[in-house]
Amino acid sequence: MSLHDPASLRTARLWRPRRVVVTAAARDHAHGRAILARAEALGLPVEALPGNRLTGLRHPDPRRAYIEAKSTLAVVVAPPAKLKLQPIPPSADWRVDLAEGCPAHCQYCYLAGSLAGPPVTRVYANLPEILSNLASYVGRGGVTSASAERAQEGTSFEASCYTDPLGIEHLSGSLSAAIRHFGAWDAPVSLRATTKFAAVEPLLGLDHGRRTRLRFSVNPVAAGRFEGGTAPLRERLSALGAVARAGYPVGLTVAPILPLPDWRAAYDDLFVQAAEALAGAPDLDLTAELITHRFTPGSKTVLEGWYPGSDLPMREDERSRKFTKFGSVKYVFPAELMREMRGELTRSLAERLPMARVLYWTRGGSLTRLPRTPPPGPGSIPPGNPRRRPAGCGRPWRSGRPGGKSSPRRSAASAGRARPGSRGPSPAGS
């Protein structure tokens, strides 16, 4: 079956949480009630909480706590801190959170080192407030807003830092609402989202105005064993082709890059398959982001608790030890291997997908931009009059404490949330 045959859009089973809880405050919002209605229509058990605290999330066994949390969808109101946007280079000017948490079971998940508490998926009921808040950030970013190579993206907003929005779209409807919001927004702005899922049918007919770039997080087939609960690679690539033919700017987030057996041929084949999926897409606007695997001592501890017996390569003696600007430790691939992987992947990508603009290559947190100035085209943001960018464009980042415990004074509702002011992980799926 061809990757751009409509029949190939039949995707893996959608996530069905075993427990859906909705707080009292969330029920006061129309978007929250709509999420509740979708869950009930699917026959999911829904629990209306009397207050705004999430309960029953803790368990003395970390593995059991993980299983229970990963089976729970919580409909809550985003806290005020979510309306104070943080920069998220190298992806975008600003991070906007439509939700927090992910239903997938990726054994390298970076949320393991970025969120405290059980990994419950929270979706925010006050979506109109979140979207209306974005206007005050236009023209103030330091990534695309300040880049000659990416200026056509306008002020960019990344929606995949702490979630995979497509993985919960059948329940939340939040990604569709955000796409429509940006499509109707007459300003130099763009929305970015990354996914490891493939259920794109609800997005294909939206009036997106080419202001949303949908990227698909991909890796060779051999890496699929580390990505439980996600759509198979073939389905993701089919979905990539479908949204490209629906006029969306698209992208490949190649992450996390791993030197698996026969990795050179495997990544080359990945790009061949992507080229097949995109064949015939009109006015194609394609980017690529290349992100290598890294881990911290804290995230490794959390992941080993979540996925005992995983054979994901995380041996410190096979890595280089690096320090972040905050003084924390991370383990990345040795420099020689890093250079070899970068050379092979960028060469293969240029050969198989010459139309792709490679935005950057990350080596475990360090960034190498691979600029290829894009020609003006249909993917460009319509001209506008962005506000003058002030001298400062966000608070300094503070590193979260990977795998740290919550303070006993924190409410149960805050368990699992991103630590305020933290940079957060790479976009979801990376």
Spans of model-derived segments:
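Flexible, acidic/Gly-rich N-terminal and inter-domain linker regions that tether
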Residues: 1-92
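Glycine-rich S-adenosyl-L-methionine
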Residues: 230-243
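Auxiliary Fe-S-binding modules of radical SAM enzymes
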Residues: 1-32, 275-430
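Conserved radical SAM core fold
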Residues: 159-168, 198-201, 212-230, 256-261, ...
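Local cysteine-cluster metal-coordination motifs and their immediate loop/turn environment
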Residues: 97-114
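Catalytic cores of alpha/beta
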Residues: 262-276
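A conserved active-site cap/scaffold subdomain adjacent to cofactor or substrate pockets
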Residues: 244-254
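Conserved Radical SAM active-site core
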Residues: 76-88, 111-215
